[in-house]
Amino acid sequence: MTDGLNKAAVFICHCSGNISEHVDIDAVKKTLKAEGISVFDYEYMCSSQGQALIKKKIVEGSLDRVVIGSCTPSKHGTLFKKCIQETGLNRAGLEIANLREQCAWVHPDRTGATEKALSLLRAKLKRLENVEPLDEIKVDIAQQALVIGGGIAGITAALNLADNGVSTVLVENNSSIGGQMAKIGKIFSPDKLAEECAMCSLSPLMNEVAAHPKITLLTRTEVESLSGSAGNFTIRLRKKPRYVKDSCTACGRCSRVCPVQVEDEFNCGHMDKKAISLRFSQSVPKIYCIDPDYCLQLNGEACGKCADACKNEAIDFSQKEEIVELNVGAVVVATGFEEYDVSQKPQYGYGIFENVLTQMELARVLGINGPTKGELLRVSDFSKASSDPTPATCDSRCEDSSDESQGTDTPKRIVMIQCVGSRDEKEGGNRYCSRYCCMAALKHASLIKKKHPETEITICYIDVRAFGFYENYYRAVQETGVNFVRGRPAEVIEKPDKSLVVRVEDTLDQKMRELPADLVVLSAAMVPSPGTRKIASVLNLSQDESGFIKERHSKLKPVDSSLDGIFVCGTAQSPKDVTDTIAQAGLAAVRARAFITDSPKVLDNEIATINQLLCTRCGECLKCPFDALSVNESGRVVLDPLICTGCGYCTKLCGEGAVQIAGFTKLQLKAEMEGVLEEGDVLGFVNSGIASLTCDNIGNSVLTYPSNVKLIKVPTGLVVDRDLVLHAFRHGASSVLFVEDPPDNPRAEVIYPLTVSHFEELKEELGDSGNRIYFKKAYVPNTKGLAGTFTSLAREGEMIR
């Protein structure tokens, strides 16, 4: 690109005051214009009008370099790249200065924020002086999608994709799809002011999945790893055996003769099942499954009764685990939630007192195929029976509970405690509202009142959050005689007869109350399932501080994950009810289909480049931990762009400087340092992955740090050598901090130890100056700790300044 600054311009976004209220944009413009730089500002640079302004000025001024001062590049980086490319400008000619998350939002001092904004813009201008055009790398996108999780979100996404012609693989780690919705018995219908059978809605969809020609269903299967790049992901799956062939007719003979009883997780442990069983009566696929942890035959004891009983010869003890590899263009994550572990709140007696349940456990008690066959009983009053191998199906009985009685009294007094583990800033709690708990309590209260109007029900609440049409449902439940006490109970006490007392302060009349109860039901928070936490790690997806998978932008890209080509929906993304889950799953499917059909795809080519003139064929770079480099037939080192992660380890290995990362060359990094640094500054080299997101989240979390902390994004700290660190010191840096991704995903598990070793080597190489470099592992939830590190180092820098 041309030399000099006459072909460059700066565009500054006000961001509706998010930037302009903290940064004096007029002062920034005046200073830059005095330096001979064209500067333009607009209220919303990301809007169609803002983009039109950028394109107009590029064409009018024959610009070949553009700096946009706006929010973090992770929000609108792709949008702005497309914007400038529409004018014919190479995307390498764009730099985005983060004036919001890493300036305006973290520096309350307007003068300091303005000075830093100037330095960030100057740094990007300097960086562009050394830019080289990036060639486009195009690849065809695999025409297959993967949906992870077989609950209502995964089912909805898979059917939407398949119905629109996309070949889809649906993976579920349990023996049946259905997820949590299969357990809840009833769903509330606010428009009808009634409750409806959940399985009546879910079961047809499950069967549609099984029969769909475009869907491959893999149960008892987990995702082990992901490699490749967006549009061409290689997914490695581990499929566990059922020990039952597909020829199983689900007659139930095997289960009837099985001598082993195990706790039934589907019924929350309040019922037993056999070691060979269906997960529930409407399971899909409707094939029995043997639990290898409890099966006598699989644990070396002579049994085989199930095999003897099976007339279809479907029992197969020889089945082994399988490894399945898929090539997919897009992934939808729908791994769901689990209930908060309410035993973390021992004051409520869960796990101590028999008659304290969660709402999910109550749902199973009220279910016709639950431990009491739908009869409302205290746990202490019913015996733990084995599940029927051919239990009740979803027929007319879903509108009525069983007439069978276990000869005990229905609980006369029930107390429900809301927000257990949510809206709770104490240890073990979660700050967020789980959104579904209030409605679940109202639903169960309504169901019980309709069948047992004499039962007294009291709901202890902080606020009843019933939005939209749900307010009508809330009022309808109130009219049935359900009592509401505003207050968070202090404790639950058990009496000798197993009855309970709930102590609570009613904050409306400011009186302490002792509420007698035969049954206490805890509305537990919705937390990420183990599968959600695991898949976020395996796929290297950003998570919020609570462990839910974080969307790229809550408004503009609510189902896009932090990685291109991977989408998230349902309760894997945040707490929500069935209605919102289905809506979001449909959107995720639309986004995944659009991504797959947009073929060929232009790759992000911030990957390794090899200068063949400098390369001595020493072979050191072939130690790439991802095997992205190889030697071709002519003896040249070549790169596989689909494998290269752009980590920069090869740049460290190459002693000739023949390998560099496109967009992060030494010249570019040095120029950016020269533009941003002043005497006494703290310079942070920030990994462009999780670490960069964590830095952005400092601003999102309304935390602050001094304005003499300057951050430069790098692929990883491996691209920063001794020469670059010394360059930083020569240009005023008091200290240099390496901020790296934690080793909590497969890629980072490889790279993190390399960055640690590299850092230790640098300290040694730098001698006395090694005491001025620091290393920080950045977890997304630890924004406060990272801000504290910045502040501590900045104070040392102020002393030098």
Swiss-Prot record:
Statement: the UniProt record of this protein carries the keyword Transcription: no
Residue ranges of the region described as Disordered: 382-409
EC number(s) per entry: 1.8.7.3
Positions of [4Fe-4S] cluster 2 binding: C258, C295, C303, C306
Cofactor details (free text): Binds 4 [4Fe-4S] cluster.
Pathway named in the protein's UniProt entry: Cofactor metabolism; coenzyme M-coenzyme B heterodisulfide reduction; coenzyme B and coenzyme M from coenzyme M-coenzyme B heterodisulfide: step 1/1
Binding sites annotated in the UniProt record for [4Fe-4S] cluster 1: C248, C251, C254, C310
Domain of life: Archaea
Domain spans labelled 4Fe-4S ferredoxin-type: 239-269, 285-320, 606-634, 635-664
Effect of a null allele: Triple hdrA1C1B1 deletion decreases methane production from methanol, but does not affect methanogenesis from acetate. Deletion results in up-regulation of CoB-SH and CoM-SH synthesis and transport, and methylsulfide methyltransferases.
GO cellular component, as recorded: cytoplasm
Matching PROSITE patterns: 4FE4S_FER_1, 4FE4S_FER_2
Binding locations of [4Fe-4S] cluster 4: C624, C644, C647, C650
MF GO annotations: 4 iron, 4 sulfur cluster binding; metal ion binding; oxidoreductase activity
BP-aspect Gene Ontology terms: methanogenesis
Main localization (coarse): cytoplasm
UniProt-annotated binding residues for FAD: 149-172
Names of required cofactors: [4Fe-4S] cluster; FAD
Family assignment from sequence similarity: Belongs to the HdrA family.
Name of this chain's protein: Ferredoxin:CoB-CoM heterodisulfide reductase subunit A
Species name: Methanosarcina acetivorans (strain ATCC 35395 / DSM 2834 / JCM 12185 / C2A)
